[in-house]
Amino acid sequence: MGSVLGLCSMASWIPCLCGSAPCLLCRCCPSGNNSTVTRLIYALFLLVGVCVACVMLIPGMEEQLNKIPGFCENEKGVVPCNILVGYKAVYRLCFGLAMFYLLLSLLMIKVKSSSDPRAAVHNGFWFFKFAAAIAIIIGAFFIPEGTFTTVWFYVGMAGAFCFILIQLVLLIDFAHSWNESWVEKMEEGNSRCWYAALLSATALNYLLSLVAIVLFFVYYTHPASCSENKAFISVNMLLCVGASVMSILPKIQESQPRSGLLQSSVITVYTMYLTWSAMTNEPETNCNPSLLSIIGYNTTSTVPKEGQSVQWWHAQGIIGLILFLLCVFYSSIRTSNNSQVNKLTLTSDESTLIEDGGARSDGSLEDGDDVHRAVDNERDGVTYSYSFFHFMLFLASLYIMMTLTNWYRYEPSREMKSQWTAVWVKISSSWIGIVLYVWTLVAPLVLTNRDFD
Protein backbone atom coordinates (compact mmCIF):
# COMPACT_ATOMS: atom_id res chain seq x y z
CA MET A 1 0.00 0.00 0.00
CA GLY A 2 2.85 2.35 0.92
CA SER A 3 4.57 1.72 -2.40
CA VAL A 4 1.36 2.52 -4.27
CA LEU A 5 1.02 5.82 -2.42
CA GLY A 6 4.67 6.54 -3.14
CA LEU A 7 4.17 5.92 -6.84
CA CYS A 8 1.11 8.18 -6.82
CA SER A 9 3.14 10.91 -5.11
CA MET A 10 5.91 10.56 -7.68
CA ALA A 11 3.37 10.61 -10.49
CA SER A 12 2.18 14.03 -9.31
CA TRP A 13 5.63 15.40 -10.17
CA ILE A 14 5.56 14.16 -13.77
CA PRO A 15 3.90 17.36 -15.11
CA CYS A 16 6.71 19.33 -13.48
CA LEU A 17 9.54 17.19 -14.82
CA CYS A 18 8.26 16.32 -18.26
CA GLY A 19 5.48 18.78 -19.08
CA SER A 20 4.74 22.45 -19.25
CA ALA A 21 2.65 22.62 -16.10
CA PRO A 22 3.77 24.97 -13.33
CA CYS A 23 6.36 23.30 -11.15
CA LEU A 24 5.26 21.68 -7.91
CA LEU A 25 6.68 23.06 -4.71
CA CYS A 26 7.49 21.17 -1.56
CA ARG A 27 4.72 21.11 1.02
CA CYS A 28 6.69 23.24 3.46
CA CYS A 29 7.06 26.04 0.91
CA PRO A 30 4.39 28.66 0.24
CA SER A 31 2.79 28.85 -3.18
CA GLY A 32 4.67 31.20 -5.43
CA ASN A 33 4.57 32.77 -8.85
CA ASN A 34 5.81 30.82 -11.83
CA SER A 35 7.98 33.74 -12.93
CA THR A 36 9.93 33.69 -9.67
CA VAL A 37 10.11 29.91 -9.18
CA THR A 38 11.42 29.35 -12.71
CA ARG A 39 14.22 31.88 -12.31
CA LEU A 40 15.22 30.40 -8.96
CA ILE A 41 15.44 26.89 -10.45
CA TYR A 42 17.71 28.08 -13.26
CA ALA A 43 19.84 29.98 -10.74
CA LEU A 44 20.07 26.91 -8.48
CA PHE A 45 21.16 24.79 -11.43
CA LEU A 46 23.94 27.28 -12.13
CA LEU A 47 24.88 27.14 -8.44
CA VAL A 48 25.20 23.34 -8.68
CA GLY A 49 27.54 23.83 -11.62
CA VAL A 50 29.63 26.25 -9.55
CA CYS A 51 29.90 23.69 -6.74
CA VAL A 52 31.03 20.98 -9.18
CA ALA A 53 33.63 23.36 -10.63
CA CYS A 54 34.94 24.08 -7.14
CA VAL A 55 35.27 20.35 -6.48
CA MET A 56 37.29 20.01 -9.69
CA LEU A 57 39.77 22.54 -8.37
CA ILE A 58 40.36 20.85 -5.01
CA PRO A 59 44.10 20.08 -4.70
CA GLY A 60 44.85 16.37 -4.92
CA MET A 61 41.60 15.52 -6.71
CA GLU A 62 43.46 13.95 -9.66
CA GLU A 63 45.54 11.90 -7.23
CA GLN A 64 42.38 10.59 -5.60
CA LEU A 65 40.87 9.69 -8.98
CA ASN A 66 44.02 7.80 -9.89
CA LYS A 67 43.46 5.59 -6.86
CA ILE A 68 40.21 4.24 -8.34
CA PRO A 69 41.16 0.90 -9.96
CA GLY A 70 40.82 0.98 -13.74
CA PHE A 71 39.22 4.43 -13.78
CA CYS A 72 41.97 6.69 -15.05
CA GLU A 73 43.61 6.38 -18.44
CA ASN A 74 47.12 6.08 -17.05
CA GLU A 75 46.04 2.89 -15.28
CA LYS A 76 44.67 1.36 -18.49
CA GLY A 77 41.32 2.86 -17.69
CA VAL A 78 39.00 4.76 -19.98
CA VAL A 79 38.90 8.23 -18.41
CA PRO A 80 41.70 10.82 -18.87
CA CYS A 81 41.68 12.08 -15.28
CA ASN A 82 43.97 15.00 -16.05
CA ILE A 83 41.14 16.78 -17.89
CA LEU A 84 38.56 16.02 -15.20
CA VAL A 85 40.28 18.31 -12.71
CA GLY A 86 42.01 21.67 -12.70
CA TYR A 87 41.42 24.76 -14.77
CA LYS A 88 40.82 22.81 -18.02
CA ALA A 89 37.92 20.98 -16.39
CA VAL A 90 36.47 24.29 -15.20
CA TYR A 91 36.74 25.68 -18.73
CA ARG A 92 34.86 22.72 -20.18
CA LEU A 93 32.21 22.63 -17.47
CA CYS A 94 31.52 26.34 -17.83
CA PHE A 95 31.55 25.99 -21.62
CA GLY A 96 28.73 23.43 -21.32
CA LEU A 97 26.75 25.63 -18.93
CA ALA A 98 27.26 28.68 -21.12
CA MET A 99 26.12 26.88 -24.27
CA PHE A 100 23.04 25.56 -22.45
CA TYR A 101 21.94 29.03 -21.40
CA LEU A 102 22.89 30.58 -24.75
CA LEU A 103 20.71 28.07 -26.63
CA LEU A 104 17.79 28.84 -24.32
CA SER A 105 18.40 32.56 -24.79
CA LEU A 106 18.18 32.22 -28.58
CA LEU A 107 15.11 30.00 -28.30
CA MET A 108 13.24 32.46 -26.06
CA ILE A 109 13.64 35.57 -28.21
CA LYS A 110 10.39 37.57 -28.43
CA VAL A 111 8.35 35.42 -26.02
CA LYS A 112 5.53 37.74 -24.92
CA SER A 113 3.41 35.57 -22.61
CA SER A 114 3.14 32.08 -21.14
CA SER A 115 0.67 31.18 -23.89
CA ASP A 116 3.59 31.08 -26.34
CA PRO A 117 4.55 27.40 -26.93
CA ARG A 118 8.18 28.26 -26.22
CA ALA A 119 7.22 29.47 -22.75
CA ALA A 120 6.30 25.87 -21.93
CA VAL A 121 9.91 24.92 -22.60
CA HIS A 122 11.11 27.75 -20.37
CA ASN A 123 8.78 26.97 -17.46
CA GLY A 124 8.65 23.18 -17.74
CA PHE A 125 10.31 20.07 -19.17
CA TRP A 126 12.90 20.29 -16.39
CA PHE A 127 14.08 16.71 -16.67
CA PHE A 128 14.77 16.98 -20.39
CA LYS A 129 16.42 20.40 -20.11
CA PHE A 130 18.78 19.39 -17.36
CA ALA A 131 19.53 16.09 -19.11
CA ALA A 132 20.41 18.11 -22.21
CA ALA A 133 22.61 20.42 -20.13
CA ILE A 134 24.48 17.48 -18.64
CA ALA A 135 24.92 15.98 -22.11
CA ILE A 136 26.38 19.27 -23.40
CA ILE A 137 28.78 19.42 -20.44
CA ILE A 138 29.91 15.84 -20.98
CA GLY A 139 30.39 16.54 -24.68
CA ALA A 140 32.55 19.55 -23.83
CA PHE A 141 35.12 17.24 -22.22
CA PHE A 142 35.64 15.55 -25.60
CA ILE A 143 36.55 18.76 -27.40
CA PRO A 144 40.14 18.49 -28.69
CA GLU A 145 42.53 20.77 -26.82
CA GLY A 146 44.05 22.63 -29.79
CA THR A 147 43.29 26.32 -29.37
CA PHE A 148 40.12 25.71 -27.35
CA THR A 149 41.53 26.93 -24.04
CA THR A 150 43.13 30.04 -25.51
CA VAL A 151 40.06 31.06 -27.51
CA TRP A 152 37.70 30.33 -24.62
CA PHE A 153 39.92 32.40 -22.30
CA TYR A 154 39.29 35.51 -24.39
CA VAL A 155 35.60 34.70 -24.83
CA GLY A 156 35.35 34.22 -21.08
CA MET A 157 37.08 37.52 -20.42
CA ALA A 158 34.67 39.40 -22.69
CA GLY A 159 31.65 37.68 -21.15
CA ALA A 160 32.90 38.29 -17.61
CA PHE A 161 33.36 41.97 -18.44
CA CYS A 162 29.74 42.18 -19.60
CA PHE A 163 28.53 40.39 -16.47
CA ILE A 164 30.44 42.83 -14.26
CA LEU A 165 28.52 45.63 -15.98
CA ILE A 166 25.25 43.81 -15.27
CA GLN A 167 26.36 43.47 -11.65
CA LEU A 168 26.90 47.21 -11.57
CA VAL A 169 23.42 47.94 -12.93
CA LEU A 170 21.87 45.56 -10.39
CA LEU A 171 23.95 47.15 -7.64
CA ILE A 172 22.81 50.63 -8.61
CA ASP A 173 19.21 49.41 -8.64
CA PHE A 174 19.68 47.79 -5.22
CA ALA A 175 21.21 50.96 -3.79
CA HIS A 176 18.34 53.11 -5.06
CA SER A 177 15.74 50.63 -3.77
CA TRP A 178 17.47 50.43 -0.39
CA ASN A 179 17.61 54.20 -0.01
CA GLU A 180 14.02 54.65 -1.20
CA SER A 181 12.72 52.05 1.23
CA TRP A 182 14.45 53.55 4.25
CA VAL A 183 13.54 57.13 3.33
CA GLU A 184 9.88 56.11 3.03
CA LYS A 185 9.98 54.49 6.47
CA MET A 186 11.71 57.56 7.86
CA GLU A 187 8.95 59.79 6.48
CA GLU A 188 6.14 57.53 7.70
CA GLY A 189 7.20 57.43 11.35
CA ASN A 190 10.01 56.87 13.85
CA SER A 191 12.17 59.17 11.76
CA ARG A 192 15.06 59.33 14.22
CA CYS A 193 15.56 55.57 14.22
CA TRP A 194 15.54 55.23 10.43
CA TYR A 195 17.65 58.36 9.98
CA ALA A 196 20.25 56.87 12.33
CA ALA A 197 20.17 53.58 10.40
CA LEU A 198 20.56 55.41 7.08
CA LEU A 199 23.42 57.48 8.42
CA SER A 200 25.14 54.46 9.98
CA ALA A 201 24.97 52.38 6.79
CA THR A 202 26.34 55.26 4.74
CA ALA A 203 29.14 55.96 7.22
CA LEU A 204 30.07 52.27 7.40
CA ASN A 205 30.37 52.01 3.61
CA TYR A 206 32.56 55.09 3.40
CA LEU A 207 34.66 53.91 6.34
CA LEU A 208 35.28 50.56 4.65
CA SER A 209 36.23 52.38 1.45
CA LEU A 210 38.62 54.69 3.30
CA VAL A 211 40.29 51.78 5.08
CA ALA A 212 40.62 49.98 1.75
CA ILE A 213 42.27 53.00 0.12
CA VAL A 214 44.79 53.29 2.96
CA LEU A 215 45.63 49.58 2.77
CA PHE A 216 45.97 49.79 -1.00
CA PHE A 217 48.52 52.60 -0.73
CA VAL A 218 50.42 50.75 2.00
CA TYR A 219 50.63 47.30 0.40
CA TYR A 220 50.09 47.75 -3.36
CA THR A 221 52.20 50.81 -4.21
CA HIS A 222 55.63 49.55 -3.14
CA PRO A 223 58.22 49.39 -4.61
CA ALA A 224 58.24 52.67 -6.51
CA SER A 225 57.83 50.84 -9.83
CA CYS A 226 54.16 50.11 -9.01
CA SER A 227 53.07 53.31 -10.72
CA GLU A 228 50.02 51.70 -12.30
CA ASN A 229 48.58 50.81 -8.89
CA LYS A 230 49.11 54.35 -7.65
CA ALA A 231 47.25 55.66 -10.67
CA PHE A 232 44.38 53.17 -10.32
CA ILE A 233 43.86 53.93 -6.63
CA SER A 234 44.11 57.71 -7.05
CA VAL A 235 41.85 57.93 -10.09
CA ASN A 236 39.13 55.72 -8.61
CA MET A 237 39.28 57.57 -5.30
CA LEU A 238 38.79 60.91 -7.06
CA LEU A 239 35.98 59.52 -9.22
CA CYS A 240 34.16 58.20 -6.15
CA VAL A 241 34.54 61.52 -4.34
CA GLY A 242 33.22 63.34 -7.40
CA ALA A 243 30.22 61.02 -7.73
CA SER A 244 29.44 61.38 -4.02
CA VAL A 245 29.56 65.18 -4.17
CA MET A 246 27.43 65.19 -7.31
CA SER A 247 24.72 63.07 -5.64
CA ILE A 248 23.98 65.84 -3.10
CA LEU A 249 24.14 68.85 -5.41
CA PRO A 250 21.00 71.05 -5.22
CA LYS A 251 20.13 70.51 -8.89
CA ILE A 252 20.40 66.73 -8.52
CA GLN A 253 18.36 66.77 -5.31
CA GLU A 254 15.71 68.88 -7.01
CA SER A 255 15.26 66.42 -9.88
CA GLN A 256 15.75 63.33 -7.69
CA PRO A 257 14.86 64.13 -4.06
CA ARG A 258 15.72 60.61 -2.92
CA SER A 259 19.17 60.43 -4.38
CA GLY A 260 21.83 60.64 -1.72
CA LEU A 261 25.02 59.43 -0.18
CA LEU A 262 23.81 55.90 0.60
CA GLN A 263 23.78 54.98 -3.09
CA SER A 264 27.14 56.69 -3.61
CA SER A 265 28.64 54.82 -0.66
CA VAL A 266 27.54 51.46 -2.07
CA ILE A 267 29.04 52.28 -5.47
CA THR A 268 32.23 53.47 -3.76
CA VAL A 269 32.65 50.19 -1.87
CA TYR A 270 32.14 48.16 -5.04
CA THR A 271 34.56 50.36 -6.96
CA MET A 272 37.20 49.75 -4.29
CA TYR A 273 36.59 46.01 -4.61
CA LEU A 274 37.07 46.16 -8.39
CA THR A 275 40.25 48.19 -7.90
CA TRP A 276 41.63 45.60 -5.49
CA SER A 277 40.56 42.75 -7.74
CA ALA A 278 42.34 44.36 -10.69
CA MET A 279 45.56 44.88 -8.75
CA THR A 280 45.61 41.24 -7.62
CA ASN A 281 45.78 40.24 -11.30
CA GLU A 282 48.89 42.25 -12.10
CA PRO A 283 51.68 40.11 -13.61
CA GLU A 284 54.29 42.00 -11.55
CA THR A 285 54.36 39.98 -8.33
CA ASN A 286 56.14 42.72 -6.35
CA CYS A 287 53.08 44.92 -6.81
CA ASN A 288 50.66 42.06 -6.19
CA PRO A 289 51.04 40.64 -2.66
CA SER A 290 48.63 37.92 -1.61
CA LEU A 291 46.24 38.56 1.27
CA LEU A 292 47.93 35.83 3.32
CA SER A 293 51.33 37.44 2.84
CA ILE A 294 49.89 40.79 3.93
CA ILE A 295 48.61 39.38 7.21
CA GLY A 296 51.87 37.46 7.73
CA TYR A 297 50.85 33.84 7.18
CA ASN A 298 52.45 33.34 3.78
CA THR A 299 55.16 35.00 1.75
CA THR A 300 54.70 33.19 -1.53
CA SER A 301 53.56 34.72 -4.79
CA THR A 302 49.93 34.69 -5.75
CA VAL A 303 50.77 33.40 -9.23
CA PRO A 304 51.26 29.62 -9.35
CA LYS A 305 54.54 28.36 -10.74
CA GLU A 306 55.07 25.33 -12.92
CA GLY A 307 53.55 22.23 -11.40
CA GLN A 308 51.38 24.15 -8.95
CA SER A 309 47.60 24.02 -9.03
CA VAL A 310 45.40 27.07 -9.32
CA GLN A 311 44.21 28.26 -5.92
CA TRP A 312 40.65 29.32 -6.55
CA TRP A 313 40.08 30.31 -2.91
CA HIS A 314 41.98 33.59 -3.10
CA ALA A 315 40.16 36.29 -1.15
CA GLN A 316 39.18 38.30 -4.21
CA GLY A 317 37.84 35.13 -5.85
CA ILE A 318 35.72 34.29 -2.82
CA ILE A 319 34.28 37.81 -2.69
CA GLY A 320 33.64 37.58 -6.44
CA LEU A 321 31.69 34.35 -5.94
CA ILE A 322 29.64 35.92 -3.15
CA LEU A 323 28.79 38.94 -5.30
CA PHE A 324 27.92 36.63 -8.18
CA LEU A 325 25.48 34.65 -6.01
CA LEU A 326 23.89 37.80 -4.60
CA CYS A 327 23.39 39.33 -8.05
CA VAL A 328 22.00 36.17 -9.66
CA PHE A 329 19.52 35.51 -6.87
CA TYR A 330 18.63 39.20 -6.59
CA SER A 331 17.79 39.27 -10.29
CA SER A 332 15.78 36.05 -9.81
CA ILE A 333 13.55 37.25 -6.97
CA ARG A 334 13.40 40.96 -7.85
CA THR A 335 9.85 42.07 -8.50
CA SER A 336 9.09 43.35 -11.96
CA ASN A 337 7.53 46.65 -10.91
CA ASN A 338 10.90 48.40 -10.90
CA SER A 339 11.50 50.40 -14.04
CA GLN A 340 15.29 50.15 -13.90
CA VAL A 341 15.16 46.35 -13.76
CA ASN A 342 12.64 46.35 -16.60
CA LYS A 343 15.04 48.39 -18.74
CA LEU A 344 17.86 45.99 -17.89
CA THR A 345 15.82 42.92 -18.80
CA LEU A 346 14.62 44.59 -22.02
CA THR A 347 10.95 44.43 -20.99
CA SER A 348 10.04 47.73 -22.56
CA ASP A 349 6.31 47.26 -23.01
CA GLU A 350 5.06 48.52 -19.66
CA SER A 351 1.49 47.53 -20.44
CA THR A 352 2.40 43.87 -20.47
CA LEU A 353 4.17 43.88 -17.14
CA ILE A 354 2.51 41.91 -14.37
CA GLU A 355 3.27 42.48 -10.73
CA ASP A 356 5.30 39.69 -9.19
CA GLY A 357 3.59 40.16 -5.87
CA GLY A 358 0.61 38.10 -4.79
CA ALA A 359 -0.62 34.87 -6.34
CA ARG A 360 -3.45 35.04 -8.80
CA SER A 361 -6.79 33.55 -7.93
CA ASP A 362 -7.99 32.78 -11.45
CA GLY A 363 -8.16 29.06 -11.07
CA SER A 364 -4.47 28.43 -11.35
CA LEU A 365 -4.47 27.39 -7.73
CA GLU A 366 -7.49 25.47 -6.65
CA ASP A 367 -9.01 26.23 -3.26
CA GLY A 368 -8.38 23.53 -0.73
CA ASP A 369 -5.59 21.98 -2.78
CA ASP A 370 -2.83 21.15 -0.32
CA VAL A 371 -0.32 20.59 -3.12
CA HIS A 372 1.72 23.75 -3.54
CA ARG A 373 2.12 24.82 -7.15
CA ALA A 374 3.80 27.73 -8.82
CA VAL A 375 1.00 29.97 -10.08
CA ASP A 376 1.11 31.04 -13.73
CA ASN A 377 1.12 34.84 -13.45
CA GLU A 378 2.28 35.50 -17.02
CA ARG A 379 -0.77 34.64 -19.10
CA ASP A 380 -1.30 38.28 -20.02
CA GLY A 381 2.36 39.13 -20.43
CA VAL A 382 5.80 38.12 -19.22
CA THR A 383 7.24 39.82 -16.14
CA TYR A 384 10.79 39.70 -17.49
CA SER A 385 12.59 38.95 -20.74
CA TYR A 386 13.14 35.19 -20.92
CA SER A 387 15.82 35.64 -23.54
CA PHE A 388 17.80 38.23 -21.61
CA PHE A 389 17.56 36.26 -18.37
CA HIS A 390 19.19 33.25 -20.03
CA PHE A 391 21.75 35.50 -21.70
CA MET A 392 22.61 36.91 -18.27
CA LEU A 393 23.17 33.37 -16.97
CA PHE A 394 25.31 32.69 -20.06
CA LEU A 395 27.50 35.64 -19.07
CA ALA A 396 27.42 34.50 -15.44
CA SER A 397 28.84 31.13 -16.48
CA LEU A 398 31.75 32.89 -18.16
CA TYR A 399 32.26 35.12 -15.13
CA ILE A 400 32.40 32.08 -12.86
CA MET A 401 34.93 30.43 -15.18
CA MET A 402 37.22 33.45 -15.00
CA THR A 403 36.74 33.93 -11.26
CA LEU A 404 37.50 30.32 -10.34
CA THR A 405 40.67 30.36 -12.45
CA ASN A 406 41.68 33.79 -11.08
CA TRP A 407 41.63 35.24 -14.62
CA TYR A 408 44.90 33.38 -15.27
CA ARG A 409 45.94 32.35 -18.76
CA TYR A 410 47.58 29.00 -19.43
CA GLU A 411 50.93 29.44 -21.17
CA PRO A 412 52.72 26.88 -23.41
CA SER A 413 55.36 26.62 -20.66
CA ARG A 414 52.63 24.94 -18.54
CA GLU A 415 52.41 27.93 -16.20
CA MET A 416 49.35 29.90 -15.15
CA LYS A 417 50.06 33.60 -15.57
CA SER A 418 48.20 36.79 -14.81
CA GLN A 419 47.52 39.06 -17.76
CA TRP A 420 47.37 42.83 -18.04
CA THR A 421 44.23 42.28 -20.09
CA ALA A 422 42.42 41.08 -16.97
CA VAL A 423 43.64 44.12 -15.05
CA TRP A 424 42.31 46.55 -17.63
CA VAL A 425 39.00 44.70 -17.95
CA LYS A 426 38.35 45.13 -14.24
CA ILE A 427 39.60 48.71 -13.99
CA SER A 428 37.63 49.82 -17.04
CA SER A 429 34.51 48.17 -15.63
CA SER A 430 34.94 50.19 -12.43
CA TRP A 431 35.11 53.39 -14.46
CA ILE A 432 32.08 52.43 -16.53
CA GLY A 433 30.20 51.64 -13.30
CA ILE A 434 30.82 55.13 -11.94
CA VAL A 435 29.77 56.63 -15.28
CA LEU A 436 26.54 54.60 -15.18
CA TYR A 437 25.80 55.80 -11.66
CA VAL A 438 26.51 59.43 -12.56
CA TRP A 439 24.22 59.04 -15.56
CA THR A 440 21.37 57.93 -13.29
CA LEU A 441 21.88 61.22 -11.44
CA VAL A 442 22.08 63.60 -14.40
CA ALA A 443 19.71 61.85 -16.82
CA PRO A 444 16.58 63.62 -15.49
CA LEU A 445 18.33 66.96 -16.06
CA VAL A 446 19.48 66.09 -19.57
CA LEU A 447 16.41 64.23 -20.84
CA THR A 448 13.73 66.52 -19.49
CA ASN A 449 11.01 65.08 -21.75
CA ARG A 450 11.24 61.60 -20.20
CA ASP A 451 9.72 60.29 -16.98
CA PHE A 452 12.31 58.83 -14.59
CA ASP A 453 10.00 58.16 -11.63
Swiss-Prot record:
It comes from Homo sapiens (Human). Glycans are attached at N298. The modification Phosphoserine is found at S351, S361, S364. The lineage of its organism: Eukaryota, Metazoa, Chordata, Craniata, Vertebrata. One of its GO terms (molecular function) is protein-macromolecule adaptor activity. Enhances the incorporation of serine into phosphatidylserine and sphingolipids. The gene is SERINC1. Belongs to the TDE1 family. This is Serine incorporator 1. It is a multi-pass membrane protein.
